[in-house]
Structure formats: C-alpha cells, structure tokens
UniProtKB/Swiss-Prot annotation:
Residue spans of biased composition, Acidic residues class: 339-370
Source organism of this protein record: Bos taurus
InterPro entries per UniProt: NAP-like_sf, NAP_family
Chain positions found as Phosphoserine: 5, 7, 12, 49, 53-54, 125, 304
GO biological process: nucleosome assembly
Residue(s) carrying N-acetylalanine: 2
Cellular compartments annotated: Nucleus; Cytoplasm
Biased composition (Polar residues): 20-29
Modification after translation: Polyglutamylated and polyglycylated. These 2 modifications occur exclusively on glutamate residues and result in either polyglutamate or polyglycine chains on the gamma-carboxyl group. Both modifications can coexist on the same protein on adjacent residues, and lowering polyglycylation levels increases polyglutamylation, and reciprocally. Polyglutamylated by TTLL4. Phosphorylated at the G0/G1 boundary but it is not phosphorylated in S-phase. Phosphorylated protein remains in the cytoplasm in a complex with histones during the G0/G1 transition, whereas dephosphorylation triggers its transport into the nucleus at the G1/S-boundary.
UniProt record similarity statement: Belongs to the nucleosome assembly protein (NAP) family.
Superkingdom of this protein's organism: Eukaryota
Subunit details: Interacts with core (H2A, H2B, H3, H4) and linker (H1) histones.
Protein name listed in UniProt: Nucleosome assembly protein 1-like 4
Length: 386
C-alpha cells in the first residue's frame, strides 16, 4: 500500500496548513478591501482614541495645570453645597415644629380622642358635585334604611386601623409585613419624625407610637437614621447632597411568648453511642416587619459588608427616607390611596419620556444611515437604644 503521508519529502499536514494560511490571507485581503468594513473599523478606532481621558492626556502641561485649578474650585463648590444642605436641615427642623400641632390634631382624630367639627369635616372633591347630582335620587331611596342600620350599630372610634391600612396600601411596606405582624400593627396610633437638635450631628428619628397591647410593653419604638452632608475626601466630586450613612434600632420588650421576630423549632438528636433520641428546642430568626428595629450596622467594627448586607442596608435607608419624606407628611393620602395613584402616574410619565427619547435616538441613527450609506447601522418611655 502506498504511503500518502509525504509529498516530495514534505509532510501532508504541513502542506494542508500552508494551504489554509494562504486561503486565510486571501480572505483577509478581500475583507479589508470592503469599504463598509473599513469604515466600521475606523469608527471603532475613532471611538477608542477620542475618550475624554485620552483627550486630556494629549493636552499641554499648562492646560492640565488650569484644569487642576478648576477641580479645586469644584471641590470648594461641593463644600458650599454641603453648607446649603445643612441650612436646609435647620429649616426642616424649624418647620417641623410648625407642622407638629397639625399632626397632633391628626392623631386625635385618628384615635377618636377628639371629634372634628362640621367645619373641619367639610371637604369637596373635584367630582363630588357631579356624583351628588347623579346619585341624589338613589340616596333618597335608601337614606332611611342607612339611618336605621347606623342606629343599630355603634359608630367606630376614630379611624380604625389607619396606619395599618397605609402599610397594606404601600408596596414597599406591605412586603415587610407578615400575617402575624398584622394584629400588632393594628395597635399603631401614630408615626412621628424628630430632627436632631441644633448643633448636633445631622440625623432624624422615626417614632412609632402604639396603644397598650398584648405583644410588648414599649409605648414607643424608635429608629434613628444618621446622616452626612459633606463631600467625601477621597471622592469629593461624588457629593450630591445629604445621605443616610447608618441607623440604630431599639430593644423591643416582648411579652412572654409574643416575640414574632423569632420562632421556636424542635430538633431530634440521636446519641452516637447509646442510640437514644432526644428532642431539643431552639429559637431561630423569623421574618417580620419588627426586624426593622434591629437593623444591620454600617459602621462600628471596621469590616466591610458583603453584597447582600449592603443591599439590605440600602433598602433600610430607602424605607426610612420614605417614611420621613412621604408617609408621615401625607399620611391621609396614602390611607385613601390618592398618593399612591400620584406616584404611579409619575413613574409612568418617566417611562413614557424615556421611550420617546429612545425613539428619537433611533430616528437619528436612521438619518445617519441615509447620509452615509457606507456606515454600518450601529430608597417617651422610648425603647432603649441598642
């Protein structure tokens, strides 16, 4: 049988490799002669070579020196901005004192300690007149029946389950609430925001006021959020205003057998030698809204947090900010759902604008393709602080 592994003393594998290399070279030459391919490569090279950092590197030393001076000015601007936000915090403290009498009256109406007058109860919505005209005849037909039913049933005191209803209405909060939390939250009578005193480090405290209940003895549960309003020395250009940097919860004095933040499990253990089995019980953490008062700490031991812990802490900061900025000032609108509808409409508007912008970008790309056909489309007995 003839041996085909050599041809004129040259191994056939080498001949095949040389042939493939020659074909590859020819194909490369053909591709590089394509104007569209060359244009695409040139565009990519241009994008790489014209980044801001590469441009700065090409500037003369005297220009770089002036840019450094501008950066120093920018740092000074950041410090002035920080001072601005400190004064805003002082204004918030001042106006919080003006709001508080209104919030105190709100609590009295909610708890039923005070009944609003007819003048205080008068309210006309935008559609109330139309609804009144359309429903007059129907209301007259059933008014006697309603009055009779009302006479039989005692009127509830205040506005039952006011704050608990807000928790249910707001997704950010309802996600934290477990079924066994609900009976406790029905005893929540008020939520207050207290700002740090003048001259003290910037912070605010959320106070959750409860009526006496069967679950814990604290009349008030607190959560303190510590804030910072100063540029980071290592990265001063990242400053965008005050930020929450840490938080403290409080110790809840649970009554015996009522702690919903832990659960008791039973576990069987078998003795290796004797083979006997015993049952032990131990407590393990349990999902609950009331874990909100035992937060992770962002500082203290000097160790960095893992990714999951950082996410948990960031979510906690967002919830605290939401209580302060939205829930407490506009509680009745979250109770009725009107504020939630406003929030949803605002989010939908943002998405619509984003879609329009994307459409404009696509249109610009199409125009470029027509001009250059070679271009390839491209957030009191108070409980003890921890």
């Amino acid at each position: 049988m003839a041996d085909n592994s050599f041809s004129d003393g040259v191994p056939s594998d080498s001949l095949e490799a040389a042939k493939n290399a020659s074909n590859t070279e020819k194909l490369t030459d053909q591709v590089m002669q394509n104007p569209q391919v060359l244009a695409a490569l040139q565009e990519r090279l241009d994008n790489v070579s014209h980044t801001p950092s590469s441009y700065i590197e090409t500037l003369p030393k005297a220009v770089k020196r002036r840019i450094n001076a501008l950066k120093q000015l920018q740092v000074k601007c950041a410090h002035i901005e920080a001072k601005f936000y400190e004064e805003v915090h002082d204004l918030e403290r001042k106006y919080a004192a003006l709001y508080q009498p209104l919030f105190d009256k709100r609590r009295e109406f909610i708890t039923g300690d005070v009944e609003p007058t007819d003048a205080e109860s008068e309210w006309h919505s935008e559609t109330e007149e139309e609804d009144k005209l359309a429903g007059d005849m129907k209301n007259k037909a059933v008014i006697a029946e309603k009055e009779a039913a009302a006479a039989e049933e005692p009127a509830p005191r205040g506005i039952p389950e006011f704050w608990f209803t807000i928790f249910r209405n707001v997704d950010m909060l309802s996600e934290l609430v477990q079924e066994y939390d609900e009976p406790i939250l029905k005893h929540l009578q008020d939520i207050k925001v207290k700002f740090s005193d003048p001259g003290q480090p910037m912070s605010f405290v959320l106070e959750f006021h409860f009526e006496p209940d069967d679950y814990f003895t604290n009349p008030v549960l607190t959560k303190t959020y510590k804030m910072k309003s100063e540029p980071d020395k290592a990265d001063p250009f990242s400053f965008e205003g005050p930020e929450i940097v840490d938080c403290d919860g409080c110790t809840i004095d649970w009554k015996k057998g009522k702690n919903v933040t832990v659960k008791t499990i039973k576990k069987k253990q078998k003795h290796k030698g004797r083979g006997t089995v015993r049952t032990i019980t131990k407590q393990v953490p349990n999902d609950s809204f009331f874990n909100f008062f035992s937060p992770l700490r962002a500082s203290g031991d000097g160790e960095s947090l893992d990714e999951d812990s950082e996410f948990t802490l960031a979510s906690d900061f967002e919830i605290g900010h939401f209580f302060r900025e939205r829930i407490v000032p506009r509680a009745v609108l979250y109770f009725t759902g009107e504020a939630i509808e406003d929030d949803d409409n605002f989010e939908e508007g943002e998405e619509g604008e984003e879609e329009e912008l994307e459409g404009d970008e696509e249109a610009e790309d199409d125009d470029d393709a027509e001009i250059n056909p070679k271009k390839e489309p491209s957030q009191p007995s108070e409980c003890k602080q921890q």
